[in-house]
Amino acid sequence: PKSRNNEITQFVKSGLNDLSISRTSFKWGIEVPNNSKHIVYVWLDALTNYISALNFPNTNDNLYKNFWPADVHIIGKDILRFHSVYWPAFLMAAKLPLPLKIYGHGWILSDDKKMSKSIGNILDPIEVINKYGIDQLRYYLVKEVSLGNDGNVSMDNLKNCINNDLANNFGNLCQRVFSFIERNCKGKLPLSSKSEQVDLILTDNLLNKVDELIDDMNKQDLNNYIKKVVEFSFNANKYFNDLEPWALKKTNVERMNTILYTIVTQIKNISI
């Protein structure tokens, strides 16, 4: 984000000094060739893993050709300098391509404070996943924490997010629609006949924003992206409630079928 870009720009403009890529103050690590008294600087060692994992120095390897340069490095703000200054310097010295983008994310806070064992405010992600599910946790973090900034999390907010967005909103919509089709259409999605304006408004509202959604994703604005998707789901619920397909079963089956086809199409689009 702009704030991180400004931070690194100012650091570079202030003047860069030579960086030693070896240390003599400890023994553990990778020895410098031809000088066992020196150990390779840990950040040179660690950052190189991005390409050594792709079988570098074999630049003809499919892994390397497919995944380097990286489209984006997503890294914590506390190690931004190592990725945005040192890592590009290492790559440029080796005449290797740079990652296309580096995105520095903020910290996840607990009760507005940095998580700390001494304070006792750590949320164990494994415990949370076992209790609520990994996709539910991912959804909550994406929706409630703006990627470029610090974000506060709490178990109460997590539960409210899961209940309000996933269970009561999208989950409830899917359950109602698919159970209705199971009971009244022998479990098969009926074909649509003639769509009315209200049907087109629902589906076009999402389709017309696809470019916006792609732009949000390219900018790593996942927070804004997911809020738009949640709005699509709320609108789909309203559509289903307002048009009451259950009231049309005996009076206008053709219209009922169109409503069902439209709402299932929208559920599919939201899921994608």
Regions found by a protein language model. Give the residues of each.
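Residue-identity detector for threonine
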Residues: 9, 24, 48, 59, ...
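Short helix-capping and inter-helix turn/linker motifs at the boundaries of alpha-helical repeat units
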Residues: 116, 201-205
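Helix-rich, typically C-terminal accessory recognition domains appended to large enzymatic cores
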Residues: 144, 157-194, 205-272
